[in-house]
Structures are given as C-alpha cells and as structure tokens.
Amino acid sequence: MVLIQEVLEIVKKRNPNEPEFLQAVTEVLESIRPGIERNKKYRDAKILERLVEPERMIQFRVPWIDDNGQIQVNRGFRVQMNSALGPYKGGLRFHPTVCASIIKFLAFEQVFKNSLTGLPMGGGKGGSDFDPKGKSDREVMRFCQSFMTELFRHVGPHTDVAE
C-alpha cells in the first residue's frame, strides 16, 4: 500500500541514524497493513503518522561521583511515546548500549504492550548508557539519585509512571 510506504519514508528521513526504531516501525506497519487498507478513517485521521512520532523525547546528562571521587557523566533518556489511553508507562533500562534509538524503539513497543492490558496506560520508556556491572552499590545509588534528580520533573502519577 502506498500509505505504509509513504509513512515509512517519512520515518526513515526523520530518523536516519536510528536502526532499532526503524526496524520496529517497519515491522509494526507491515503487520497492520490489512487493517489500514480496509479502514479509510484511520488514513484520514493520520493514525500511522501519529503512532510513529513520540509525543515527547527528553535527553539529559547524568553527572555522578564514583567511589574514587571522580565525576562521571552519562546520558539519560525518556521517550513519552503515546498517552492516548492514559499516562505514559514503561520501565527504565541501564546498559552501556542504550541510545536514543533503542529507547525510542522500546517506547514504541511499550505502547502496544500496555494497550493489550486493557488498563488506561500509554507507552513510554527511559534509560541511560550507565553500566551497573562492576559498580558498587553506592555508585549505583549515586547514579540513580542523579538520574532521578532530572527525570522527576517529567514524571508523576497522572503524567508518566516510570517503573
């Protein structure tokens, strides 16, 4: 269908360096193709275009002090993908490979996972490129405190429920 291809081209143009996100969007759009083709109202309401664009993306620095007294700086992310059904809901991932593309892809998939519960929850996801492996409990605590010092401004029970 032309619409699916048009939307995929827009997504690729806007997100050229986000392979994980592009793969997830491609797979989902291809899987819902029959429903979109049968229902003109979805096309007219630009459902696909709204589905693939996050409502909000937040990227921030996370400075923290390691056990040697050295300042470390990591990146933090929160993608608030869709709140059509309720507040954003989705967990946090701390792993050295975390980047905007991965968090965006996870937030995109979280929308569908949450919608299947029947509960009024939207979809979101957050995380950081912080690697907790090999870190002391105190280092993990200091990192998490710094991470939440920024993230708390963007989450809450009626807005975004970060797990």
Q: Model features per residue range: what roles?
A:
Residues M1-E163:
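N-terminal ligand-binding/catalytic initiation module
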